[in-house]
Amino acid sequence: MRPLTPRQAEILDLIKRNIAETGMPPTRAEIASRLGFKSANAAEEHLKALAKKGCIEIMPGTSRGIRLAGDELEDQPDPGLPLIGQVAAGEPILAQEHVEQYYQVDPAMFRPHADFLLRVRGDSMKDIGILDGDLLAVHKMNQARNGQVVVARVEDDVTVKRFEKQGNVVYLHAENEAFAPIRVDLANQSLTIEGLAVGVIRNGDWL
């Protein structure tokens, strides 16, 4: 690897520390603010230089699109499980821009292992102990069997429900009698299974 200038080394150290502390790389604006640059564009030029030297990879289209590369990946702690926030229409649920933060939770605590966390909103699943504000541990998968509790995307809405398929129609059942099932006709509606619910962390109390 080609040697770094003092400023490049400073930026690389900032990126490493930010990932270690928050699980995410800094934005260009955050780099500029912390290191006293006049604009985010100045930070971008240094990032391009670091990418040319093989220290990082730049992923276009996202403000935190910075990834450590090569030898810089060594000694970096596992960031943990990503907590998924608001999911944009048409984007993969694990896209970096959907990640609010990372939690130090061992994926192997769950069977099958967890790939991400999703914050529960509402009480449609309260009768099986999935409550508003809980963190739902989810195993990434794209198929489900009848009776499984899944994270599903119907059109552009993400929901947690019990899965039932009858022919070309899927019913997503709540575990709360106040909520009617969601009926999805696969002939003319979009349904994506994002994962299987494998555990609950109650209101994030022990994170």
Swiss-Prot record:
Domain of life where this protein originates: Bacteria
Top-level EC class: hydrolase
MF terms (GO), sorted A to Z: DNA binding; serine-type endopeptidase activity
Site features described as Cleavage, chain residue numbers: 89-90
Subunit: Homodimer.
Family as reported in the entry's similarity comment: Belongs to the peptidase S24 family.
HAMAP family the UniProt entry points to: LexA
Protein name from the UniProt record: LexA repressor
Top-level taxonomy: Bacteria, Pseudomonadati, Pseudomonadota, Gammaproteobacteria, Alteromonadales
Designated gene of the protein: lexA
